[in-house]
Structure formats: C-alpha cells, structure tokens
A protein has these predicted regions:
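Hydrophobic membrane-insertion alpha-helices, especially the h-region
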Residues: 4-21
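Catalytic glycan-binding domains that act on GlcNAc-containing polysaccharides
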Residues: 24-188
C-alpha cells in the first residue's frame, strides 16, 4: 500500500469521527459565535501584551493593562507591531502619562504639539490615549517616508530628518532595539 494513500485514508477516517464545526442550519447564533472569536482573540492579545509590559519593563500591572489596550488598538490602526509601539513609549516616557520634555514634547509617546498637532487631527495630545494613537500615526508615516526602513523612521521620530544629530539617532535606535528584544524574548 502506498504511504500517501494510507495517510489520505487515515485523514478521511479521522474527518468522519470529528463532529462538524459548521452546523447544518446556519442561523444568526452561529454568526454571533463566529464574530465573538475576534473580540476574544483581541482581549487575549491585549492581556499578553499587558503581561509583557509588566515582565519586560517592570510596568505596574494597572498601567500595563491600560496602555496595552491603547497600544494594541494603535498597532491595528497603523499596522505597526504592538511591541515596537510599546518599546517606543517605554524609551520615550517609561509609560508616564503627563510627562513634558524640555523640548516641549508631551505625553507617553512624547509628541511635539507644535509639529504634529494638525497631522494627528487636532487631538488632545495631553490625553494619554490620543497621544499613543498620534505617536503610532507619526511612526507609521515615518516608516512610509523611509520606505520601510525602521532605523531611519525611529531616528527621524527622535531627532528629525535634518541636522547633525545622527549620533543621537543611533543611540535612540539602540535603546528601542534593547527594549524590543526585552519584550520579544520573554517566556510568558
């Protein structure tokens, strides 16, 4: 007997023993069950990110829980890895909500209202949730502008495109990389 046909027969026999997942009559309750999988999966992803923030950065659990929802939503909106956004926020503000830099950057993502207020749709950049969304929007824009080169985008996020602060940009990229490694190498 050919092994390939033997495996196919085993697979078909296994299918006959498994109860069908899709009901014979598809009613509205089936669709509700299917739609509930997505929010459940999102909650699980947010919880995993929250745990990573606690273990990887030492963030207080309540702060991690709050930020993980915002970060996860921002990552979906702007198609950026949630761990990258979390690393940026960790480096920029250590998840402090109302921090203001000596250069006028505000909030967890350290957004400069003078430069980015209009770009982010005149959101209240002092609101930490809106600040996280705006920071992710800026990073997404910079990634596009840098043609997908994350080092270029992160350096531009920190020091801009022009000027002679390229060494500071390199140090910033190294900090983000260390933070990102801390999150990605966690065993949960």
């Amino acid at each position: 007997m050919n092994i390939r046909f033997g495996l196919i027969g085993f697979f078909v026999a296994g299918l006959l023993l498994i109860p069908p997942v899709i009901p014979n009559e598809v009613d509205s309750s089936y669709f509700h069950q299917a739609l509930d999988l997505s929010p459940r999966a999102e909650r699980l992803s947010e919880e995993m990110l929250s745990n990573k923030l606690v273990k990887g950065f030492g963030t207080h659990p309540l702060v991690a829980e709050e930020f993980s929802g915002w970060i996860y939503e921002a990552s979906k909106r702007h198609r950026i890895e949630a761990e990258l956004i979390a690393s940026l926020i960790s480096v920029e503000s250590s998840f402090r909500k109302s921090v203001v830099s000596h250069r006028g950057a505000v909030g967890p993502a350290q957004v400069k209202p003078k430069h980015w207020q209009d770009f982010c749709g005149n959101n209240d950049l002092y609101d930490p949730e809106q600040n996280v969304y705006c920071g992710a929007m800026i990073l997404s824009y910079l990634i596009d502008r840098c043609q997908g080169e994350y080092g270029c985008a992160l350096s531009a996020y920190n020091v801009g495109f022009y000027g002679d602060r390229w060494q500071a940009g390199k140090r910033y990229i190294a900090k983000i990389d260390r933070s990102l490694d801390a999150l990605q190498n966690l065993a949960l």
